[in-house]
UniProtKB/Swiss-Prot annotation:
Residues 199-209 have a biased composition (Basic and acidic residues). This is rRNA-processing protein efg1. It is found in: Nucleus, Nucleolus. Residues 270-279 have a biased composition (Polar residues). The keyword Zinc does not apply. It comes from the Eukaryota. Belongs to the EFG1 family. InterPro entries: Efg1 (IPR019310), EFG1_rRNA-proc (IPR050786). Disulfide bonds: none annotated. GO terms for biological process: maturation of SSU-rRNA from tricistronic rRNA transcript (SSU-rRNA, 5.8S rRNA, LSU-rRNA). Residues 49-155 form a coiled coil. PANTHER family: RRNA-PROCESSING PROTEIN EFG1. Residues 1-52, 199-305 are annotated as: Disordered.
Length: 305
């Protein structure tokens, strides 16, 4: 049995196909691929579903600043900076939410108008190749320029803004001709200008100039100075004028000063209690005596007259 060949005996360039030689690691390693970074204006912003989370954070920080009056200065500054950052993040999230809504709303209109502009542009190119007269060539070039702007209008119209249709819907011939000959939307001129400057991508992803915000503006609470609590002063007690009690006994002096005699009150209370008990007992006994008198029958006794 023949021994196995060593790896050093084999010729690597002959074993590997030339088209795959780049994939084989050798003395010269394969250069790493560089990641393409998106432009700053084309990066996707915060997702629309994070709006509620950001609003909750803003509410928490606002309540903290309103209620905690004795916060240290450094903590208050950090909270105010965080609040400003969350407000900016909320504005970006709401703008992205509006952008997604507009894309979904005008997707079909943009698609059909883009297809229509592409078909018309192909027809004009064929006519341009077949035409021979100079005047017709110039006219076709002007029409091609208009259709190229129309095509770019359907592709690079700002996604966050309301899309205005270029072509009239199907209807009567006169209405279609009138609508076709009317002026282009105001955005059409901007698209034409951006074609010359080469800034169509920036136009497509630009933010709307004035967006209607659904959230109320958050105001920072004003810091109130904590005043020390004042201790109320005791009211002066008015003293009654002195009464001359010479020649009076103790009970008279107490009556003069307005002090109730507890002993007399107790006796009166006991008297009233005893009187009510005696009265109830007398009523019961009287009723019994009346019953006995009514039921007494003479039996011819000794004491009867």
């Amino acid at each position: 049995m023949a021994p196995k060949r060593k790896l050093s005996d084999s010729d690597a360039p002959e074993v590997v196909h030339p088209s795959r030689q780049v994939q084989v690691y050798g003395d010269e390693p394969k250069p790493a691929k560089k990641r393409k970074s998106e432009p700053a204006f084309n990066k996707k912003q915060a997702h629309a579903s994070s709006v509620n989370t950001i609003k909750k954070k803003i509410r928490d920080i606002t309540r903290k600043l309103e209620r905690a009056q004795d916060l240290p200065a450094d903590v208050r500054v950090e909270d105010e900076r965080a609040l400003a950052a969350y407000q900016q993040e909320l504005a970006s999230a709401e703008a992205e939410k509006i952008r997604q809504k507009m894309i979904k709303k005008y997707h079909m209109v943009r698609f059909f108008e883009r297809q229509k502009a592409t078909r018309q542009l192909k027809k004009l190119r064929k006519r341009l190749l077949d035409s021979e007269s100079t005047e017709e060539v110039e006219q076709l070039k002007d029409e091609m320029h208009i259709l190229e702007v129309d095509l770019n209008y359907t592709q690079y119209h700002p996604l966050s803004e309301t899309y205005i249709s270029l072509y009239p819907p199907k209807g009567s011939g006169e209405d279609a001709e009138v609508k076709a000959t009317k002026e282009k939307p105001p955005m059409w001129k901007e698209v034409e200008k951006c074609m010359e400057e080469g800034t169509l991508d920036r136009l497509r992803n630009r933010k709307p100039e004035a967006t209607v915000s659904t959230t109320k503006p958050v105001r920072l609470p004003e810091r109130k100075l904590v005043k020390p609590k004042s201790i109320p002063k005791p009211k002066p007690v008015e003293q009654a004028p002195a009464i001359d009690t010479t020649g009076m006994n103790r009970r008279q002096r107490r009556a003069q000063r307005g002090v109730k005699d507890s002993r007399a009150t107790k006796i009166a209370k006991n008297k009233s209690t005893g009187f009510s008990k005696n009265q109830a007992f007398g009523a019961v006994e009287g009723a019994r005596a009346d019953e006995a008198q009514d039921g007494n029958v003479s039996d011819g006794g000794f004491f009867e007259e």
